[in-house]
Amino acid sequence: MEISAQMVKELRERTGAGMMDCKNALAEANGDFEKAIEILRKKGLAKAAKKAGRETKEGLIISYVHHNGKIGVLLELNCETDFVARTDDFKELGNKIAMHIAAMSPRWVTREEVPADVIEKEKEIYREQLKDSGKPAQVIEKIIEGKLESFYQDNCLLEQKFALDQNVTIKDMIQQAIAKIGENIQVSRFVRMQIGE
């Protein structure tokens, strides 16, 4: 199948990838846009992984206050250079993440930040729920691990599904931005406040 300039342009607009990357992905996918996007995402994630070790000393503090004035978020989003911190793409990513935090109430940025005593308490609760199930101990441990994964997905920002698109996690969104912008990006911390909490 012949890849037209219009097809390349459309794919670039949808993904933010480079022109030759788009053309090659379309050729590899025989003109199938969804396949081409998947190919680019896989390559983009590889690019993001290469940039993950770089230091992020620049960035922005992004604020979001819900329209009713009862929920507010402060988010520290870091990148490598001040130039990137001033771009619309970076600011838009920060705003999306801050709105997500307001809506979904994560407690930690990553699973590594969850205190050990909280994890033990959760495991204890799950064991108590399953003690009369009659299942073997190793099966119960597997179930507990599965429940713990769900706990992380509910409470850790990077593992949560994005509030406005359940097909991607916050981590996926950040990796897509890294692939598009070309710099490492990290959420350092956030504070979510709500009247009465």
Curated annotation (Swiss-Prot):
Annotated region described as Involved in Mg(2+) ion dislocation from EF-Tu, given as residue ranges: 81-84
Protein localization: Cytoplasm
GO molecular function: translation elongation factor activity
UniProt key word Nuclease: no
Record keywords, A-Z: Cytoplasm, Elongation factor, Protein biosynthesis
InterPro entries per record: EF-Ts_dimer_sf, Transl_elong_EFTs/EF1B, Transl_elong_EFTs/EF1B_dimer, Transl_elong_Ts_CS, UBA-like_sf
SUPFAM superfamilies assigned to the protein according to its UniProt record, in alphabetical order: Elongation factor Ts (EF-Ts), dimerisation domain (SSF54713), UBA-like (SSF46934)
A Pfam family recorded for this sequence: EF_TS
Gene3D superfamilies from the UniProt entry: 1.10.286.20, DNA helicase RuvA subunit, C-terminal domain (1.10.8.10), Elongation factor Ts, dimerisation domain (3.30.479.20)
Main location group: cytoplasm
Any one of the GO CC terms: cytoplasm
Entry function: Associates with the EF-Tu.GDP complex and induces the exchange of GDP to GTP. It remains bound to the aminoacyl-tRNA.EF-Tu.GTP complex up to the GTP hydrolysis stage on the ribosome.
HAMAP family in alphabetical order: EF_Ts (MF_00050)
Similarity comment text for this entry: Belongs to the EF-Ts family.
Protein name per Swiss-Prot or TrEMBL: Elongation factor Ts
Organism: Fervidobacterium nodosum (strain ATCC 35602 / DSM 5306 / Rt17-B1)
